Amino acid sequence: MRIEIFSDVICPWCFIGKRRFETAISRLQARGIDIQVDYSFKPFQLDPTASSSETTYAKDAYAKKFGGEQRAAEILQHVTNVAAQDNIEFNMDVALRANTFTAHRLLAFALINHGSATQILLKERLMRAYFTDGQNIADTAVLVSCAVETGIDETVARQFLESDELVTEVQYEIAQATEYGVTAVPTFIINGQWSVPGAQDVEMFERILERMHANS
């Protein structure tokens, strides 16, 4: 089963959806179901106008988008509580607004050169850098550090990030989301045909995956 997940590093529901999706796979395998899921991440930018060089707090961007600090605080507290139920720590008071295009380039590089397992690890690490550690994921040093933690050579990662390699390819993949009808993330594209939008609960992911496995 092949699944492509359109997702953004700064999307809280993408982190939650990733965790629930992976939990569903683990549960199915624990039940003795021989399900093999080849999944990887595709780029989507929720905030393409964010600066790549200047940092502001993400909570300020939420306040501007949702009509004030109080409403933003309510939204961020809600998603923090939901994340905690899936054993994810959000520290939204320190999260920094950042342009994610370069992070998406690095994720594409990881997939092409190191495979989906490394890309999945890198995706997790980048999201933790943003949501938990309050790091600027548009910063080259942060991106290199995350890459190294997932087994990518430091010099190779830095040279890649300082180049324009995969810029055109990632731009194309972002545009490809429109072709699939993706308007929000996360969106899970199964075998290039079926679309599952949103951070479904674990039980729903289990049912979907089990049904697809039975029909394969």
Each model region followed by its residue ranges:
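Structural alpha/beta surface segment adjacent to cysteine/selenocysteine redox centers
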Residues: 19-130
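C-terminal cap of thioredoxin/glutaredoxin-like
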Residues: 3-6, 10, 16-33, 37, ...
